[in-house]
A protein has these predicted regions:
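Conserved N-terminal beta-strand and adjoining loop/helix that marks the start
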Residues: 1-25, 44
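Short secondary-structure boundary/capping segments
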Residues: 7-8, 16, 32-34, 83, ...
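Active-site-adjacent beta-strand/loop module that shapes the phosphate/pyrophosphate-binding cleft
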Residues: 22, 79-103, 113, 117-119, ...
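Conserved Nudix-box catalytic region and its N-terminal flanking loop in Nudix hydrolases
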Residues: 23-64
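A generic structural signal for short hydrophobic patches within well-formed alpha-helices
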Residues: 48, 120-121
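A short coil-to-beta-strand element that immediately follows conserved catalytic motifs
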Residues: 69-78
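Short, charged, solvent-exposed linker or helix-capping segments at domain edges/interfaces
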Residues: 102-108, 123-127
Length: 145
């Protein structure tokens, strides 16, 4: 018996930035061959540097991709993200409320915008992220519209 599924190649941190109406900031990934979730809408995030803790990773990556600095990140979950045909990685997710003050810019990917939960089916979003979005809304005590 092999443990191929346990070959985790790295650690990734991401942030679910939500508005009080439950909309979530999502980034449209570039359409590049070899890019995981290419052409899909996902929350901003990225790989941890060596010896970097995951909350610092998520905050740094979010700033690098959006210019927005999340100052009150809260842990959601951590799990091994496995997609067929790709090496797996450890994904750690955090969330924060959008302060409605700082400007958000698209510094990576094709586009970035807040998507309303009831319109999520109009976008190519990985299904597991929809479940995590719903969990985050419960944690934040926001009712889905």
């Amino acid at each position: 018996m092999t443990n191929d599924y346990k070959q985790v190649i790295g650690r990734v941190g991401a942030v679910l930035l939500i508005r009080k109406n439950g909309s979530l900031l999502m980034q449209l990934r570039d359409n590049k061959e070899g890019l995981r979730h290419s052409g899909k809408w996902v929350p901003p995030g990225g790989h941890a540097e060596q010896s970097e803790d995951m909350i610092s990773c998520a905050r740094r990556e979010f700033v690098e991709e959006t210019s927005y600095d999340c100052v009150d990140l809260k842990f959601i979950t951590e799990f091994e993200d496995r997609v067929e045909g790709w090496p797996s990685y450890e994904l750690t997710l955090f969330w924060d409320y959008y302060d409605e003050i700082q400007e958000i810019r698209c510094l990576e990917g094709q586009d970035i915008k807040f998507i309303r939960r009831e319109e999520a089916n109009l976008y190519d979003i990985p299904k597991y992220l929809l479940n995590l979005w719903d969990i985050t809304l419960k944690i934040a005590n926001i009712k889905k519209e």
